[in-house]
A protein has these predicted regions:
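A structural signal for multi-pass alpha-helical bundles of membrane permease subunits
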Residues: 4-275
Length: 275
């Protein structure tokens, strides 16, 4: 390829680069504004100041003195990690079973499972609250994670990825005398690391950012999560936006770290699910 052709191609790519720069700016600016607002006073934020200030420690002190920040962070980590581990185990077993075992009625059951994705969460919230209240599960980890540890989307995701798992390996393992449990844990799980990583990212972020159900089920401030804490910072009279953005920053850091660490595996797992 001649230099003239390369120059022509580069000129044609200029609009694409400009578009990507604009999209990147639109995507990154809210994150920058959140960090900047966490370092400014509420008055500066209200006036539209976008440059970083020097009031982060003041906002942080106000946040920790007025709200149980560390308790909320600990609760969110505990609920999110526990939900992720249990959800991955249950949904992967279900997705694996739907693909590997060929029983009568399997397809109908899977269709019913997919139809459950059409039911909004708010439609089942009141019945679930009454059931959990009678069972004494209010303000408990079980009450938090039970409705979300098995989601149709996660089961479908593992089911789609399980299609790439070689059936011949399963048959060979059975001939060698491996139990179904050992086949799943020693052969299926190691080959589906990307799927597990993608599912872990989605489940962790959903559990961490969950607000409506914890707000209903958690009536004790000792069980408060980070989204509930942030909601408490928004009052009907005067809202300290600097302190609010400081809380949002602490709430956002864990999910950003999880995504950045597992972004490669996340992309691979999602790609495998849509094939």
């Amino acid at each position: 390829m001649t230099k003239k052709n390369k120059s022509a191609i580069q000129r044609r790519l200029i609009p694409t680069y400009i578009f990507l720069i604009i999209v990147s700016f639109i995507s990154v600016f809210p994150l920058y504004w959140m960090i900047s607002a966490a370092t400014n006073t509420s008055t500066d934020v209200s006036r539209g100041r976008i440059l970083p200030g020097s009031h982060f420690m003041e906002n942080f002190h106000n946040l920790t003195s007025q709200q149980p920040l560390w308790r909320a962070l600990g609760n969110s980590f505990f609920y999110a990690i526990l939900t992720t581990v249990i959800c991955l185990l249950i949904c992967s077993i279900a997705g694996y079973g739907f693909e590997v075992y060929h029983d009568k009625g399997k397809d109908r059951l899977f269709s019913i499972l997919l139809l459950a994705m059409m039911v909004p969460q708010v439609a089942t919230m009141v019945p679930l609250f009454k059931m959990f209240s009678k069972a004494g599960l209010l303000n408990t980890a079980v009450g938090f994670i039970l409705p979300i540890i098995s989601t149709p989307f996660m089961i479908m995701m593992f089911h789609q990825n399980a299609r790439s798992f070689p059936v011949d390996i399963i048959e060979a393992a059975r001939i060698d005398g491996l139990s179904e449990v050992r086949i799943f844990f020693q052969m299926f799980i190691p080959t589906m690391k990307s799927t597990y990583a993608a599912a872990a990212v989605i489940t962790f972020m959903n559990a961490w950012n969950s607000y409506l159900w914890p707000k209903v089920i958690m009536t004790d401030n000792k069980a408060m999560t980070m989204p509930m804490l942030i909601a408490n910072l928004i009052t009907g009279y005067v809202t300290d936006y600097g302190m609010l953005m400081c809380g949002v920053l602490f709430c956002s850091i864990p999910t950003m770290v999880v995504f950045f660490v597992l972004q490669k595996q996340f992309a691979e797992g999602i790609t495998g699910a849509v094939k």
